Amino acid sequence: MAMKIPKSGYNRFMKEGAQHFKGTDEAVQRNIEACTELASQIRSAYGPNGMNKMVINHIEKLFVTNDAATILKELEIQHPAARIIIMATEMQEKQIGDNTNTVVILAAALLEHAANLIHMGMTPQEVAAGYEQAAEKALEILPTLVVKEATDMKNIEEVRQYIRSAITSKQYDNEDIIADLVAKACVTTCPANSFNFNVDNIRICKIIGSGVHTSTVMNGMVFKRGAEGEIREARDARIAVYTCPFDLTQTETKGTVLIENADELRNFSKGEEAEVEEQVKAIADNGVKVVVAAGKFGDMYLHFLNKYKIMAVRLTSKFDLRRLCRTVGAQPQARICAPAVNLLGHCDSVAVQEIGDENVVVFDKKSETGKVATIIIRGSSQSRIDDVERAVDDAVNTYKALTKDGKLLAGAGAVEIELAKEIESFGAKAPGLEQYAIKKFAHALETLPKAIAENAGMPTTETLTKLYAEHVAGKKNAGIDIWKRETMDAVVNNIFDLYAGKRLAIKLATDAASTILKVDQIIMSKQATGGPKPRGPKAQDEDDDGMA
């Protein structure tokens, strides 16, 4: 029997192929390098002049976007430290829907400055403690920098100003068009108590062709399909909705019928036809002009629906069916019957229209503010439309956040410079080694306006110097004007940042950086090989809000 020499160190406890990194040089520095490398890919996408990234994911779907959450999600990054920052951006996306780039860039800047402090002799724990003190101070100062509060969420002009900045960072040059569409859609569907606003009530229909400037918004719903029968339009229509197929039910058992002469053949389906006509006539007698069903329409039912001038629309998605019921005020029926009048929905116009080369069914509630609005997005390519959709989502989420907390800050990098100035002076007065980390926190905040200037092609050092001079002179709202390539008053130019979004971004970025700094060991088991990849959860409607 051959002698087996045991491994030395930590590897003796681990399986073959496991990896282990320990200490400042191996673990902490590796993590910092991974996170700064990640942020370097995202930094050029920050701000109105940010560059787009072209990402092709594992199923070869193409994304052209500058949205950090989308880029990081589709890259499928595996590094454990980088994953911590990605989880922070996912939380920001989930709670606010904007400022995801801010989280990545700020967290990486904090780690980059921490690497310098560690190299000078500070411990990661001291750096993390200093960062936490600085973040606490920043969150204390932030409420004093509020410049405006959104009060009237039913005023389209006012709402347009507030959501414009969220769109500008995604769709520069189209921000006015998109802001107008989103403001109209949000105000139309906003309930009496704006706190109860539901983002699921803003629907998006994407149709390739023309340009973004031809996009429209309407009060109602649009479905990318045609009508089933011959009737293609109904005005002032009562609508019956069925969750079952609009067809004859078939029994599971098969039967055999013996037909001996022509009369028996002629009379074979006469009773069936009479029954179907009776059902459709009863529906028509209730004033129904449109029938919507979740399944297919049988030929015989379609014949009699055409005879009684009833429009037939098929929706295959149960989620679309629920939203339509909410839009028109109908109660869905589980079987074919003539529903009572109070169970029917109503719509001013239901019509099949051709937009581009696509047939769509439009449920238009012209006469009233409805519960659901649809934004029809046009564009020259699928990736272009998808990016506009992401900008619309950000704007709608901004409106939602404003209904919860209406406080606004000056945008264009003004808040970051003011915070950096205040925290720098706070660090100068702080005792102990933490003061160096506090000052570095202030320098990390400068990274955000610096990225805006850099992506706009402006000299960064000169721009930051001018900004600091303005803020020291008491102009707290001085930000970067990328058009005139100089400083400006962000509030006068209606450039705002969400208070809630900025607050959460600072908190998440600091927490992510502190967590990574406090890791001194990385232990990775050998990856399992062979066998299929575990299946994820069954796909659901991504916009479903769990309605019953």
Swiss-Prot record:
<keyword id="KW-0963">Cytoplasm</keyword>
<dbReference type="GO" id="GO:0051082">
    <property type="term" value="F:unfolded protein binding"/>
</dbReference>
<dbReference type="InterPro" id="IPR002194">
    <property type="entry name" value="Chaperonin_TCP-1_CS"/>
</dbReference>
<dbReference type="Pfam" id="PF00118">
    <property type="entry name" value="Cpn60_TCP1"/>
</dbReference>
<dbReference type="InterPro" id="IPR027409">
    <property type="entry name" value="GroEL-like_apical_dom_sf"/>
</dbReference>
<keyword id="KW-0067">ATP-binding</keyword>
<dbReference type="GO" id="GO:0016887">
    <property type="term" value="F:ATP hydrolysis activity"/>
</dbReference>
<dbReference type="GO" id="GO:0005524">
    <property type="term" value="F:ATP binding"/>
</dbReference>
<comment type="similarity">
    <text>Belongs to the TCP-1 chaperonin family.</text>
</comment>
<dbReference type="GO" id="GO:0006457">
    <property type="term" value="P:protein folding"/>
</dbReference>
<dbReference type="InterPro" id="IPR027413">
    <property type="entry name" value="GROEL-like_equatorial_sf"/>
</dbReference>
<feature type="region of interest" description="Disordered">
    <location>
        <begin position="527"/>
        <end position="548"/>
    </location>
</feature>
<protein>
    <recommendedName>
        <fullName>T-complex protein 1 subunit theta</fullName>
    </recommendedName>
</protein>
<comment type="subunit">
    <text>Heterooligomeric complex.</text>
</comment>
<dbReference type="InterPro" id="IPR002423">
    <property type="entry name" value="Cpn60/GroEL/TCP-1"/>
</dbReference>
<dbReference type="InterPro" id="IPR027410">
    <property type="entry name" value="TCP-1-like_intermed_sf"/>
</dbReference>
<dbReference type="GO" id="GO:0005832">
    <property type="term" value="C:chaperonin-containing T-complex"/>
</dbReference>
<keyword id="KW-0547">Nucleotide-binding</keyword>
<keyword id="KW-0143">Chaperone</keyword>
<dbReference type="GO" id="GO:0140662">
    <property type="term" value="F:ATP-dependent protein folding chaperone"/>
</dbReference>
<dbReference type="InterPro" id="IPR017998">
    <property type="entry name" value="Chaperone_TCP-1"/>
</dbReference>
<comment type="function">
    <text>Molecular chaperone; assists the folding of proteins upon ATP hydrolysis. Known to play a role, in vitro, in the folding of actin and tubulin. Required for correct subcellular localization of pgl-1.</text>
</comment>
<dbReference type="InterPro" id="IPR012721">
    <property type="entry name" value="Chap_CCT_theta"/>
</dbReference>
